[in-house]
Amino acid sequence: MPANFYFGDALIFLRQGKKVARFGWNGKNMWLHLQKPDMNSKMTLPYIYMKTAQGDLVPWLASQTDILAVDWEIV
């Protein structure tokens, strides 16, 4: 798979347990990961979270720019 790919490909990689990021994001060391709930989790469905440039983990929602971008990469 090339270094830069579509958001749809990023979703496939997230489902495989990989971390993905956009080359165009301003903050470095930012990435996304798919969290799958376990028995101890308060969440009941999988969700995507982001590691921010400050090192925090937060829930993430894609913008239209993110969805249409072709600069996604595996971290």
Regions found by a protein language model. Name each.
Residues 50-75:
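Short, compact, well-ordered microdomains
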Residues 1-52:
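Extended non-catalytic interaction/regulatory regions in multidomain proteins
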